[in-house]
Amino acid sequence: SQSVFLIKIPAHSRWMFAIGCLVLAAFFFISFFFHRKGILISLVGVLAAILFFINGTYSFQLLGQDEIAWSEPNSMKIEKYKWTDLEEVVLHIPSYEQRRYEGLEHLMVFTFKDGNILTMVRDKAFTDQIGKIDGSIRRYQVEYRTEDM
């Protein structure tokens, strides 16, 4: 959709898909040796892999023109908010030493009026869309500030 300008998929999702593929391959390999139970073993493997695939699918962070949505890893619950539901946005800036030696990155923390919090790493994909994100923050007059880590 054109109204979505950033979707972040955490490493957790990629791991879930990789584990699902390995589980599927392992069950197919095992079913090769057990001819009588091969179909049952394959079916169990497919079902186990599907669980990992579903778990990986429900882990994302989304920023759009109209909404902010995310789902935590290992959760099937999707949190959806409008930009008007935001209380404040805080950019946490690590020091030079923290970035260089500890590998810390800038963090954007979105705090909602109901107390829910979304933390996003401000990486290259985020920075590429910063104009649209800042535009939404200004358009909806959300309090914005920076803090040192």
How would you describe each model-predicted region?
Residues V121-M149:
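Terminal and domain-flanking low-complexity segments
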Residues S1-K8, L107, F112, M149:
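N-terminal secretory/membrane-targeting helices
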Residues S42-Y81:
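Conserved beta-hairpin
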Residues F33-V44:
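Membrane-interfacial entry segments at the cytosolic side of transmembrane helices
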Residues E72-T127:
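Non-transmembrane, membrane-adjacent beta-strand/coil modules in membrane-associated proteins
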